[in-house]
């Protein structure tokens, strides 16, 4: 119907007054309108739940995302951080260092402390150092080095730690492979990552029968490295070098490799050690799949602090009662439990 202006109600003078409720209807609401051929974003939020700086940051990212969409960029190519937000200062004590440097420092301080334990046994920091040196030398002799990727297929065993530490000592990045993946997916990941080297336990050799690159059997490392000493100079990684490549689930298409540099990994290690106060007395459990980036939270920090890394056996990971008992029996002090 029509709207009629009036200035009296019941014979008394009346005047319209706008009233502001000064209250957000929801914790956060975003409205988009067009004004003079421009998109206008308005954010309404509850001040008792969010800081103004947080909302400004959200608005900035919305602007970047909207601009990328209007330029018809692919979603994965849109950077949601301004350049000044993409770097984080390292602890001055660790400036210019990488995980490899911090691990070697831990070996010097705690050579005989247990470093990694799985369902079948454990190895000390000295043993992990020697075994990973062996892996690194074999990779180096194959021409492996910085900015190169190596696949790891060994299930949830302590050999996984031997492998990824060895790969990083040789300067490269590791690509975790899950033995439960279809062979076609493993083949795609190895080809897409350009991995010319593969570290595998004999149990899973059939899964990679197609592979024509360099293969190192992790089953032989423990015995072969007993009296081993390095005879080549390793190319240690620099902070700007690639640390790992973990592939997405591929639920919306082909899996995509997500890459992280050593300096980013070091920032995460420092954050975990600071917030969890990781010490040599800790037993840190690794629960997440190695092919899920949540695994990185627990794989690295303990091995820079002299703590023990415990790898949950695959056969109990999906049994909540067994997991709870394992936590108690192993005296776990820290762990990350993402959804399965």
Identify the residue ranges that each predicted region occupies.
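A short, small/polar-residue-rich loop/turn motif at beta-strand boundaries
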Residues: 1-28
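Carrier-protein-dependent adenylate-forming modules in NRPS/ANL systems
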Residues: 25, 36-77, 91-266, 274-277, ...
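Short beta-strand micro-motifs enriched in acidic
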Residues: 31-35
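Active-site beta-alpha turn of Rossmann-fold NAD(P)-dependent dehydrogenases/reductases
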Residues: 154-155, 246-249, 282, 288, ...
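Conserved donor-binding loops in enzymes that form glycosidic bonds
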Residues: 179, 247, 288-289, 313-314, ...
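Short, Asp-centered acidic motifs that coordinate Mg2+ and/or phosphate
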Residues: 188, 196-197, 283, 332-334
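Short beta-strand and adjacent tight-turn residues that come in two discontinuous sequence segments
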Residues: 200, 312, 337
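Conserved AMP-binding/adenylation subdomain of ANL enzymes
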Residues: 256-285, 292-333
């Amino acid at each position: 119907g029509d709207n009629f202006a009036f200035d009296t109600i019941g014979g008394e003078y009346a005047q319209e007054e706008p009233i502001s409720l000064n209250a957000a209807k929801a914790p956060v609401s975003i409205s988009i309108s067009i004004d003079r051929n421009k998109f206008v974003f308005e954010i309404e939020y509850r001040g008792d739940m969010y800081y103004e700086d947080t909302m400004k940051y959200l608005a900035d990212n919305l602007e970047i995302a909207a601009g990328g969409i209007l330029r018809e960029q692919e979603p994965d190519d849109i950077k949601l951080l301004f350049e000044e937000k993409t770097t984080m200062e390292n602890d001055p004590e660790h400036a210019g260092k990488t995980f490899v440097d911090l691990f070697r420092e831990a070996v010097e301080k705690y050579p005989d402390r247990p470093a990694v334990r799985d369902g079948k046994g454990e190895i000390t920091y000295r043993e992990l150092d020697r075994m990973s040196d062996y892996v690194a030398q074999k990779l180096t002799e194959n021409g492996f080095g910085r900015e190169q990727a190596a696949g790891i297929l060994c299930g949830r065993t302590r050999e996984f730690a031997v492998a990824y530490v060895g790969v990083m000592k040789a300067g490269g990045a590791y690509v975790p492979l899950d033995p439960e993946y279809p062979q076609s997916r493993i083949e795609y990941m190895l080809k897409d990552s350009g991995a010319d080297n593969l570290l595998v336990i004999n149990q899973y050799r059939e899964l990679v029968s197609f592979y024509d690159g360099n293969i190192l059997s992790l089953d032989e490392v423990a015995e072969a490295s007993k009296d081993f000493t390095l005879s080549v100079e390793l190319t240690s990684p620099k902070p700007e070098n690639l640390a790992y490549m973990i592939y997405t689930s591929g639920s919306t298409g082909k899996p995509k490799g997500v890459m992280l540099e050593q300096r980013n990994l070091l920032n995460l290690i420092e954050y975990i050690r600071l917030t969890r106060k990781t010490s040599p007395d800790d037993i840190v459990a690794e629960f997440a799949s190695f092919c899920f980036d949540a695994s990185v939270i627990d794989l690295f920090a303990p091995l820079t602090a002299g703590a023990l890394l415990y790898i949950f056996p695959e056969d109990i990971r999906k049994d909540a009662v067994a997991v709870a008992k394992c936590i108690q029996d192993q005296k776990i002090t820290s762990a990350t439990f993402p959804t399965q």
